[in-house]
């Protein structure tokens, strides 16, 4: 018992913290998320994931394409070596409709938090591998315009998560995002 209390005390003192996203969308219809999207806002658990134009998870989602197998193809833009590069990521379906497995950008899961399919989609990319646990989330919109309702939902979803940096883009910045 003393060892258990000591271990618990050490864990609390050392700040051991797992990043866990508990809120995912129920009943996601992957076919309805297909199409063009724009990255309106981003947030991350670690400042270095988004702080610079070429930061590892500062990516701009361009399009989501469901595959016949039920996976999700994610087309995105990312700054690399001083220029904009297009990337394609395949997010593999899992038993949970709103959770996908990926092996890209040093992340291992994509979780859809919420969407109305027509205007906005909120998602997070999670790396649960020790010791580099990290979380980055985005608010996507269908048109390159600021959507205050979507931003409010994004901020509400982030409250339960350990975010340390948040970026939001105005319409001019949305139009000027990394494009190939």
UniProtKB/Swiss-Prot annotation:
Its main location: secreted. GO terms for molecular function: retinol binding. It holds the Pfam family Lipocalin. InterPro entries: Blactoglobulin (IPR002447), Calycin (IPR012674), Lipocalin (IPR002345), Lipocalin_CS (IPR022272), Lipocln_cytosolic_FA-bd_dom (IPR000566). Residues 1-18 form the signal peptide. It is found in: Secreted. Disulfide bonds join 84-178, 124-137, 124-139. Keywords: Disulfide bond, Milk protein, Retinol-binding, Secreted, Signal, Transport. Alternate disulfide bonds occur in equal amounts. One of its GO terms (cellular component) is extracellular region. Lactoglobulin is the primary component of whey, it binds retinol and is probably involved in the transport of that molecule. Under physiological conditions beta-lactoglobulin exists as an equilibrium mixture of monomeric and dimeric forms. Belongs to the calycin superfamily. Lipocalin family. This is Beta-lactoglobulin-1/B.
């Amino acid at each position: 018992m003393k060892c258990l209390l000591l271990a618990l005390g050490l864990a609390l003192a050392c700040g051991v913290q797992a990043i866990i996203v508990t809120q995912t969308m129920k009943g996601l219809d992957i076919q309805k998320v297909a199409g063009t999207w724009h990255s309106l806002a981003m947030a991350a658990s670690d400042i270095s994931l988004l702080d610079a134009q070429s930061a590892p998870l500062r990516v701009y989602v361009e399009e989501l394409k469901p595959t016949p197998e039920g996976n999700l193809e994610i087309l995105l833009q990312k700054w690399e070596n001083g220029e904009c590069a297009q990337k394609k990521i395949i997010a593999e379906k899992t038993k949970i409709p709103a959770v996908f497995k990926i092996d890209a950008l040093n992340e291992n899961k994509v979780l859809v938090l919420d969407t109305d399919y027509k205007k906005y989609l909120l998602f997070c990319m999670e790396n649960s591998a020790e010791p580099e646990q990290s979380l980055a989330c985005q608010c996507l919109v269908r048109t390159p315009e600021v959507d205050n309702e979507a931003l409010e939902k994004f901020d509400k979803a982030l409250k339960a998560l350990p975010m340390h940096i948040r970026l939001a883009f105005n319409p001019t910045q949305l139009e000027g995002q990394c494009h190939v």
